[in-house]
A protein has these predicted regions:
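Active-site lining segments that contact anionic ligands and/or coordinate catalytic metals
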Residues: 258, 274-276, 283, 308-312, ...
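Dual-mode signal for accessory low-complexity, basic/Gly-rich regions
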Residues: 288-359
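Extended hydrophobic packing segments that form well-structured cores
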Residues: 365-410
Length: 410
């Protein structure tokens, strides 16, 4: 699938090297062992990066397991065609043994995002899309358990396409310049640069954890939201799980979220675009929602089990992020710096890695729920870049401003 611009081979080679060498590590910075099996999933629109990823995996002493996914192209919209012709039992089908075998086999997972058509599923009923997502939950559970046990490293990165650039109001070359800048690909050694950035955000996360924050109150023209955190939470940051990533995040106690937030960034999900989103929470549950576009998809997401509760609260310091405008892709939009950084929350599944302690592997979902860690097949990051202040209430009852005007203040 030919694009109007393809980055030079030297740059793609450097990008692939960054994805493998920096992306394949856990949140503690431990690198994946040589000889590991790395699965890399690449859409057809990103074929040039597939070539260099395979090479980088081999050069670093690992075993590549590539998955090449057809991109929607004119009459050959494979994704939409599945939903058009699949019966309910086919939408609900999951090849459990096959998926479990894949997860058991791999030590690392790389996913490349490259939309040939951000609206590929616009004609498909949202309910059917969510039905499919729900049916795949067992496969996600296999993967999640392996990640939580520290036995599976994963990362996500972006390959620019004409369709994505158009959606963001740029030429493809301009779009790629944003990727290059955000990932520091013009640096002599991007891996070294990212190791330095990672140390900075990890230090911020550790400081927040040491504060023993009980709750945060987010206030601004578009938000008045209080989220319970609790003493059994830690804050995490960066790592190689997303490239790029400047965010610092935790999992709130889903039962203790109250207030309102308007999200000024569009939300791209399931081949559709939600705009003008507003959410109202009472005792941890979304009790009211609005959207100026595709509200029916938002409603379907909220009706998915656990989809109406929060699994993540995140902040990005504007001083670190090189992303200055919307890229029409959540991976980048949740890391926007700009003038005021960004706040994003995630509807759906929590990060159990944010538990501050050593979890018992026998703990069931119900026990995690009792600890305030939400469970869901969805994890939908929704984003605001407007000016806001975040005030924390600490264990001793005192308050402290931890984030203001786009900067951490701790």
């Amino acid at each position: 699938m030919k694009q109007s611009y393809t980055p030079p081979a030297t740059l793609l080679e450097k990008y692939a090297d960054l994805i493998v060498r920096f992306g394949m590590q856990n949140k503690d910075g431990k690198k994946i062992k040589k000889g590991s099996v790395i699965q890399f999933t690449v859409p057809e629109a990103a074929k040039p990066l597939y070539f260099y990823l395979q090479r980088a995996i081999l050069k670093n002493g690992h075993h590549p397991m590539g998955i090449f996914v057809p991109s929607p192209d004119g009459q050959y919209n494979v994704q939409a065609d599945f939903y058009t012709h699949a019966a309910k039992k086919q939408v609900d089908f999951i090849a459990k043994k096959f998926i479990k075998g894949q997860v058991d086999q791999i030590d690392g997972s790389i996913q490349i995002l490259a939309e040939a058509d951000p609206h590929a599923l616009k004609s498909i009923e949202s309910k059917k899309i969510m039905q499919r997502a729900q049916s795949q939950n067992p496969g996600l559970s296999y993967r999640r358990r392996k990640i939580e046990s520290g036995k599976l490293d994963w990362t996500i990165a972006l390959y620019g396409t004409d369709a994505m650039a158009k959606e963001a109001g740029m030429t493809l070359k301009e779009y790629w310049q944003q990727i290059i800048k955000a990932c520091y690909l013009n640096d002599k050694d991007p891996v070294a640069t990212w190791n330095t950035i990672n140390k900075t955000v990890q230090t911020t996360a550790k400081k927040l954890t040491k504060l023993r924050i009980q709750s945060v109150h987010v206030v601004g023209s578009d938000v008045d939201l209080t989220l319970g955190i609790g003493s059994n939470r830690k804050w995490l940051a960066g790592g190689g799980c997303n490239i790029p990533s400047y965010e610092v995040f935790t999992t709130p106690n889903w039962t203790d979220v109250n207030g309102w937030i308007r999200l000024n960034q569009p939300h791209y999900r399931y081949g559709k675009k939600i705009e003008g989103m507003e959410l109202w929470f009472e005792s941890g549950v979304v009790v009211k929602s609005k959207a100026s576009k595709n509200h029916e998809l938002l409603e379907s997401m909220l009706k998915t089990p656990g989809g109406n509760k929060l699994g993540e609260f995140s902040l990005t310091d504007a001083r670190l992020s090189k992303i200055t405008k919307s890229m029409a892709e959540i991976l980048y939009d949740e890391n926007i710096g700009g003038t005021y950084g960004n706040t994003h929350i995630a509807l759906g599944s929590a990060y159990r890695e944010c538990y501050d302690g050593t979890p018992d592997p026998t703990w069931k979902t119900a026990y995690w729920e009792a600890l305030g860690f939400n469970s869901s097949v969805v994890h939908s990051d929704v984003i605001s870049t407007t000016k806001r202040t975040v005030t924390a209430t600490l264990e001793n009852g005192t308050t402290k401003v931890i984030y203001k005007d786009g900067h951490f203040s701790i």
